[in-house]
Every structure is written in structure tokens, then in C-alpha cells.
Amino acid sequence: LMYMEGCTAPQFETSTLHSAVVELVALKGAKIQYVTVQNWSSNVFNMVTKRGLAMEDAEIRWIDCNIGSGLTMKYPAVVLKGRRARGEVISIALANTGQHQDTGAKMIHAADDTTSNIVSKSISIGEGRASYRGQVIMGKGLKGCKNNTECDALLLAANSRTDTYPAITVKGDGGTVQHEASVSQVSEEMLFYMQQRGIPKAAAMSLAVNGFINDLVQEFPMEYSVELRRLIDLEMEDSIG
């Protein structure tokens, strides 16, 4: 089962709160994929609860992209309750000046031979701030559990900000956990090289950003990946002027 949603809103004079709750239950052998592209206006406070329960041999995937809103706080969760259950969170966040994208994931291993994967990429533009908050819990006495977490950040300006807050709790010795994080910048040399070949600065920045998130964008359905790339191009044009 795949469910897709797109979120957007016009700019109003007053602030707006969006507080949605999504709950998924994947029974034995079921597979659920939930795809979101969020592009709320900058005066929206986007505070969302997303959680899933995966039973034996079930799989839940959250594929999430946050571009809009002034403040986003969203941490999709999967409780791996059945043996050989699988959970995955794919997350893209883009924060421009005046935005704080506070996103992440939670994986709770509650059965043997469960597997979880978290891949998060964020882009900070201007004075934008992107934060990753992740939590991985493996219960006591479990065997054969595996988790992989990757969180990478790209800073596009001197005042851009990124934060990473991982929390990993392993209560036994029967699990494998690995965590990787990186922060990088778009080099002036690369921008200069592309501009010398007739590529405007905004287009050059868009190419760099799209290259950074390309592997995750491919996880989105075709119509959503095209829209996502276009939204990023618009953000880059607005930020560069």
C-alpha cells in the first residue's frame, strides 16, 4: 500500500497551526509506504505526529520532504513489534532564512531480527536552520537487530545552521547499530567553475543541491520527484535573487 500527500497553503496575515496525526498498522507480511511533500507558507507552525506499528515480516516506510512552514517539528516513528519487521525513514529538509526545519525519526526494536534504516539530508540557505533529532531503541534480550542511521547536512551560507541530536539506546548485546553524520558546504571554486561556463549562480546552486539529495529524491514517485526539484529551484532563485 502506498499513500501520497502534498501539503501547501497561501500566505495569511495571521499564523496558523497544522497539527496532524498519522497512525499506520502493518499486519503480518504487509508493506506500507507513506509519502509526503510539505510546502506550507512561512507563517504555518507545522507540528505533526507520525507513528507506525510493524508486526511480523511487515514493513513501514516513511518518505518525507519538508520545504515550507516557519517551524516544522516532525519525527516519524516505527515500532518494530514483530519478528523480522522492517522500518525505514527517508527525510529531506530545506530551511531558508526565517525557517527552522526540526525533523528526524524514531525506531523502537521490540522483537528479534528486526531491521531499521534512517537516512536524513538537510539543506540550510541564508540564515535557515535545520535540525535532526533521532532516537533508536533496542530492547533487552533481543537478538539479530540491526540499525543504520545516516544524517548529512549541506550549508549554503556563512550564517546557515545545522544541528544533530542522535540518541541511541541498546539494552543488550544482540544488536548492531551504526551512525554516520556529515556537514559540508558548496565551495566557491565549484560555483566559480560553473559560472565561468555560463551557468547563473542560482542555477549552479540548484545543481549542487539537487546533486546532494539526488539519491533520496529517486525514492519519491515520479510526479512528486519532479515537483520537489522544481520547488527547490524556486527556493534557490528566491534566495539568490
Segments the model singles out, each with a brief description of its role:
Residues S187, S206-D215:
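Small/polar glycine-rich anion-binding or flexible loop at a beta-alpha turn
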Residues L1-I199, V217-G241:
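Conserved beta-strand/loop scaffold segments within soluble protein domains that form the structured core
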Residues A203:
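Conserved tryptophan-centered aromatic signature that marks the ligand-binding surface of SH3
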